[in-house]
Each structure stands twice: as structure tokens, then as C-alpha cells.
Design a protein with these regions (language model features):
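Boundary regions of SH3-family modules and the immediately adjacent low-complexity/disordered segments
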Residues: 21-42, 90-132
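Short aromatic-glycine-enriched beta-strand elements
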Residues: 84-88
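Sec/Tat signal peptide C-region and signal peptidase I cleavage site
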Residues: 16-20
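Sec-dependent signal peptide recognition
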Residues: 2-8
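SH3/SH3-like (including bacterial SH3b) beta-barrel domains
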Residues: 59-73
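Short, basic/aromatic beta-hairpin or loop at an interaction surface
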Residues: 44-56
């Protein structure tokens, strides 16, 4: 049993590192002393329930990046940046705004988002602005 503990710890560390490195293009948050780390919020809307019914969260701003998650109509997210038609987002697993994401307060320095919530890129066509 004692031999398995170091192995389990190493596997947990590798899993955490691989989750943090899933984004090919990091979501950058912060950089403003007087403004929230992510400047606005939105909600997923307009998805066809008879289609695939989800909005693909991508590892970067484009269709050729890996899909890393799925979002559904009504889910809320923080919009932290944009590149072309793509929003850089932070979102909680519950699909609602969460204080624990820590992006609704100022971050004086701009830096890649590493958690505790999820981050990625979504096409702006399926995001309606709610706040910000």
C-alpha cells in the first residue's frame, strides 16, 4: 500500500497538469486595476434542440481546434476576451455564474486562467450578452 501512494500522487499531478495544458490558446484574464478580470457575461442561446444541441468549447479560437467540452442553451459564462468570431470564456461546471471562478473582481496583471473553473473558446454566434 505504501508503494502505491507515490504512484497515485504522480498520476494525480500529471492529470492536473494535462487539464491545465488542454488549451492550445490560453484564455487571458485580468490586466486592469479597476475592472473585473473578465469584462462581461453571457448566456448560451439559439442552439437547435433538433440539431446536435450543444455549443462546442474549443481549445483555441477556431473550428480546427480540439473540442474540450460542450455547453447547452441557458448556460451562463464569463466573456474574458475575443479573437475574430470567437470568445475566450470562463465557466463553471454547473452552467451558472459562480463566485468561485474568481473573475468578477479585478486582477491587476493579465495572465492565463488556470482555474478553479473551466476555460475555453466558443463561437460568438451562440452567446447572448447579459452583463458588462
Amino acid at each position: 500500500m505504501k508503494r502505491l501512494l507515490p504512484i497515485a500522487a504522480a498520476i494525480a499531478a500529471l492529470t492536473t497538469a494535462s487539464m491545465a495544458n488542454r488549451l492550445a490558446v490560453p484564455v487571458i484574464v485580468g490586466g486592469e486595476q479597476d475592472y473585473d478580470a473578465c469584462g462581461s457575461g453571457g448566456t448560451v442561446e439559439g442552439l437547435n434542440p433538433r440539431g446536435d444541441g450543444f455549443l462546442a468549447v474549443k481549445a483555441g479560437p477556431g473550428v480546427n481546434f480540439e473540442r474540450i467540452d460542450k455547453l447547452y442553451n441557458g448556460m451562463q459564462l464569463y466573456i474574458c476576451g475575443e479573437q475574430g468570431d470567437w470568445f475566450a470564456i470562463v465557466y463553471s461546471q454547473t452552467g451558472s455564474w459562480s463566485e468561485r471562478c474568481n473573475v468578477s473582481t479585478p486582477w491587476p496583471r493579465a495572465m492565463p486562467y488556470t482555474g478553479p473553473c473551466r476555460a475555453g473558446w466558443v463561437h460568438r454566434r451562440w452567446v447572448g450578452s447579459l452583463a458588462g
